[in-house]
A protein has these predicted regions:
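A short beta-strand-turn-helix
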Residues: 32-53
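Thiol-/selenol-based redox modules, centered on thioredoxin-like
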Residues: 134-178
Length: 178
């Protein structure tokens, strides 16, 4: 476990050297991920059609990451028309087959899962996984949370983004849905 943490920290430092760290309210660099079905999704593409985009970075080797995915799936079902979702593994050895196994094991139905998130993850300067970020339609970071967010908190965050015109920069989870 200690070796894994050191390796992850080293990778994060290397990656953040190639990306400017996205601070709350500042632009998020565009990136593209590979979806389970082999298609590509770019952050910029979703930002053209959605009010905001939720980025959820996870790693299969952390059990708690998978525990958060049902909450993300529920949010996708509720807010998917207004908010884009990029749910992406940061694991370099992740494959379409391992994503399919994770989907089956966690009873995920329609939540889109993607590969290739490690370099995009680095731009947020976080040492924690899972990481949840909401990007405003203008491409700026509107919310960032390290760790398991949970269904109720995620719902409160996304409700604010759906109901607000213009960019947000929320430092904490709202106490109640507005």
């Amino acid at each position: 476990m200690k070796q894994t943490f050191v390796l992850l920290l080293t990778l994060m430092l290397i990656l953040t050297a190639s990306f400017a760290v996205a601070q709350l309210g500042e632009p998020v660099q565009d990136f593209t991920v590979v979806n389970e079905n082999g298609t590509l999704t770019a952050l910029s593409g979703l930002l053209q059609t959605k009010k905001a985009v939720l980025l959820h970075f996870f790693a299969g080797w952390l059990d708690e990451d998978y525990s958060d995915l049902p909450a993300v799936q529920a949010a996708y079902a509720q807010y998917g028309e207004d908010i884009g979702f990029i749910v992406v593994s940061v694991e370099e050895q992740e494959t379409v087959q391992s994503l399919a196994a994770a989907r089956a094991q966690n009873e995920l139905t329609d939540l889109p899962l993607s590969l290739g998130g490690l370099s995009a993850f680095g731009q947020f300067g976080s040492a924690y996984i899972p990481l949840t970020v909401v990007v405003n339609a203008d491409g700026t970071s509107g919310f960032e949370f390290d760790g398991v967010l949970g269904a109720e908190a995620l719902e409160r965050v996304l409700a604010v983004f759906v109901r607000t015109d213009g960019p947000l920069a929320m430092e904490t989870v709202p106490q109640e849905a507005k």
